[in-house]
Amino acid sequence: MSFDVGALVRARGREWVVLPESNDEPGLLLLRPLGGTEDEVTGIYLPLETVESANFHLPDPASDLGNHLSCGLLRDAVRLGFRSGAGPFRSLARVAVEPRPYQLVPLLMALKLDPIRMLIADDVGIGKTVEACLVARELIDRGEVRGLSVLCPPHLAEQWQKALAEQFHIHAELVLSATAARLERSCRQDESLFERYAFTVVSTDYIKSDKRRDEFLRTSPDLVIVDEAHTCAAAPGRSASQQRHELLRALVAPNTEDGASRHLILITATPHSGNEETFRSLLSLLDPRFASLPVDLSGEENRKHREGLARHFVQRRRADLEAYLDTVTPFPQREIAESHYTLTAEYRRYFDRVLAFCRESVLDDTLEKRRQRVRWWSALALLRALASSPAAAAATLRSRSATADGETVEQVDEEGRRAVLDLDEDNAEGIDVIPGTETGEEEAGERERLLRLAREADTLAGKGDAKLARAFELVEQFLGDGYAPILFCRFIPTVAYVATFLREKLERRGVVVEAVTGLLPPDERERRVEALGAHDKRVLVCTDCLSEGINLQQHFDAVLHYDLSWNPTRHEQREGRVDRYGQPQKKVRTLTYYGQDNPVDGIVLQVLLRKHKAIHKQLGIMVPLPSDSEVIEEAIQQGLFLRGESPVQQLSLFPELDKLWDAAVDREKRSRTLFAQNQLLAAVNTEVRAELDEVRRVIGAEADVRRFTRTALRTLGAVVSGDEPLQVDLRETPRALRDAVGHGERLSAVFSGQPRKGSLLLTRTHPVVEGLAAHVLETALDSALVGPARRCGVVRTSSVTLRTTLLLLRMRFHIVNQGRDGKERPLLAEDLVLAGFTGSPERAEWLPSDSLEALLDLGADSNIDAEQARTHLRRVIERFEDLLPRLDQIAEARGKALFDAHRRVRKATKSGVRALKVDAHKPADVLGVYIYLPAAMGELR
């Protein structure tokens, strides 16, 4: 005997719902208990066990009678328990996060494409990870994709794995250099690990080698998400970036069957590095035609180009999203300040000696070009290290230059720019190492001079370092004002130096100081950050290995730039670790820290950072550093080496660099205007509003979770107090409830944002809410159990003038999808519907659906005798046959609406993935029957 998906069956003494996966193996039924959770799914082998069709019985007035709260509690328990919701988005019933309305825009845009090729370039801290994962979860739940790979820098891999599992219930394997061999051991001889594991998070550095690249191209899944996508643009002279670009280009090659149909989602906050050709290479991954777009897309003649690109590209400022569709997103307010220090006399004299040495080294025109460039970069590296700390300066003076091995001028310059100028946008890995000064070509006297300078630097540590002393005062101010600060440093020795000093000063006061650098593997970095977050008073000292991708907002709310980055974008990335959605504090602080008489800081602050901040303040957007590094090098050389002893304060703005900044601003303004997607977004916004209302109706929203949790816990005997966080004492509740909730006798919870230490974030899929809903539903369906919700009730109220009957209906739908391979793929959808009428069942006057919600909030104005209430209920239940034709009509109408919604949001049909039909299981399950009597009605009518 076969059973349709969604059918109600009886086996092992209870009722079950047939799940879609039952079609995967002949003779095997996968069943979920009626009223149970996903954790209770069971397989039954038909040749060995008996399974029969079942019907859902009507409520029994003798044992199922409840009060006025019963219907609302039962309704909330059922819909919060749905994991196959019948709304337009199947994924939202499964995710452990309630997306902000603006985060649904990329999802709607993506579903209008086939294949999906999206570039999500929203500002830092808006939630691009959530936006991309929503698309992935939706495609999985629609049966359109069977696998997913996330390509990301290795230091972000564990964070991606955690987000996929905890927020989207996608359990992915990490494919890194350290894990690949273990994963491959579980594969068959002819099986790739990407065939073995449907969901993976893959290091872009691991996969780009030719051997691994070819294997990935052969077996990669049909959906790929690329984080930090700007590092995958084709960039002249950057072999790593070029390799990554070639991999992605091959993944979506239109001349291969898999490539032409593969979905690709690119994520980056900085899509445009300033190089138009590089930007076009990124766009070409969305559509090869975008590679040849005109440089200037303005004008009516380019409207089609703009509209075509706008369908694939979403880029929004945070300011535009703080209030979106009547929903306010609580982004923190950023307090920006500067602070400075003055070099001690001893440090100033030492700085002058080092600067003189560097000028002498750089301006030696007797050397051949390659040696000149090595010396230039070595001198610049030394000055950067000296501006950072005595420890960094000493280490640099004792280390070999990172550029010394370059065989050509071009190789020397490429390595120098990467190691010194912070212009490498690939990622923050490896940039915190000391670049070194020794070239290997020094005379003995020159080498001794370097070592003597290193020994002098050693003597300046501690008391001779005004920068460190002033920074300690600033950290004390942060802590005194209740902030948990992060100090970002440029070099590894500086982190160790600063962290050691702060520990000596602060640990006796109960402040815990932790140091994190690129020397630690990514998983150890996260462990240290999490461990530090458990302390009330904490300070994190780190390099830029934590400036990208890592979310630190849960434990930290202030940033001190101990060392100035020479790339303003890096400052924005640092501050974005704490200034982002989910920050529990209303305000965050950022402090730019510099030496007032430090010539290195002066140049960087004047020509790069302040200019960048002024542009950001004026436009509200982040403009990348001009990409012409030669002009930047010239500005630095003019300021540091060719202007003699001119005070930093007297340096004029450098005209060539100013021109570059102005050009970058014009380009960004023009780009934002051209790609503003005003017409497209206006249409999408209207659609988001309509679909969001339907989603909330079907599966509930944050407010429903909050209301249900409070009401259910109180009625079950828990002591509930407070607001945010909610404090719950479960000691006097039934043991079955404590077992279902699974968090001991006490818990603290919030329903939005980031929970503080010791609190839970309760979403509709959190085990606490899931367990509570399952307990309420189970005790309602089993009349032998005592619970807060019952399946029927009678309420006397002055809010109705005629006897009104409210029916709580659970509907199950069997959706048949057709995949790319032409095979039918069954899906299950569940919906909860209210139906109501006045009068008796045989002469029912059906009420409009939009008038029924108000009945759930009605309280009792007077009591009614229990036996009289049962008599009213029996009259309805005994004549229920008269209501079935109307209920079948409602089920058919809901099925049609579900079919239309399924097709409406997935308009693209090129792949052939489509809903063929939606069948409603009839009759609908009648979960509850509730009668509302006029207050003056004293007898049966």
Which functions belong to the PLM regions below?
Residues I44-L73, V78-L108, P115-I116, K128-C133, ...:
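SF2 helicase/translocase NTPase motor core
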Residues A387, D405, R417, G430-P435, ...:
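P-loop NTPase motor cores of the ASCE clade
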Residues A136, P330-L343, Q372, R384, ...:
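Conserved Helicase C-terminal RecA-like lobe
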Residues S209-D210, S273-N275, V541-F556, G576, ...:
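SF2 helicase motor core recognition
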Residues Q189, R196, V201-P221, A233-E414, ...:
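Inter-lobe coupling linker of SF2 helicases/translocases
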Residues D579-L609:
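Conserved segment of the helicase C-terminal RecA-like domain
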Residues S220, T278-S281, N551-D563, R589-T592:
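A short beta-strand element within the Helicase C-terminal
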Residues E131, V135, T278, R470:
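Hydrophobic positions on the alpha1 helix immediately C-terminal to the Walker A/P-loop
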